[in-house]
Amino acid sequence: MRRETMIDYINPSTEEIARQLLGKLLIHQTPTHTYSGYIVETEAYLGVEDMACHSYAGRRTPRLESMYKIGGTVYVYTMHTHHMLNIVTKEAGNPQAVLIRAVEPLQGTVQMGKNRKATGITVCNGPGKLTKAMEITKALDGVLINEGSLCITEGKVPSIIAISPRVGIPNKEDWTAKPLRYYVKGHPFVSGMKKREILHEKEYWL
């Protein structure tokens, strides 16, 4: 039986939740396949004050409604035909979230490769890649994590958590450079990881 995480998606800061999600096991159970992978990269989006956040300045549309729900709600949006998986944080009405940017595949790896038409680290080393690999779509938008087909359970512990500015956030004043991206240092499945930066598995997991 899977063991669920004890992550509190409401009381800690969104930045802290983004850190806590690293190493956790993301599981998607479809009617035909079980997919899972360890989360290795996340980004925090801090709500109405964050110029890079969809809910900046209190923006609220039907597409964004899931962001305004209670922490632990799944928020899936589409960007350039790619689905992006987020976990909403904080209390209802405080629209913050963590974007899941990359995972290390564990279960269903063969089918993941078929879904992506890719192999190796390119299968899940990006937010749109992992959702396609794991068949995560807008159908999951608005559900609560661990109460349906999408779960997050205990996994591994990162040796070192690295921090950087978020990816692809231009022209957002001070928010462009804010260090709100978190990743497992040296992990090959982190997006944009250079070969010279990749560590041995014993070095990036405890």
Outline where the language-model segments fall.
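Conserved, well-structured core segments that form or line functional sites
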Residues: M1-L206
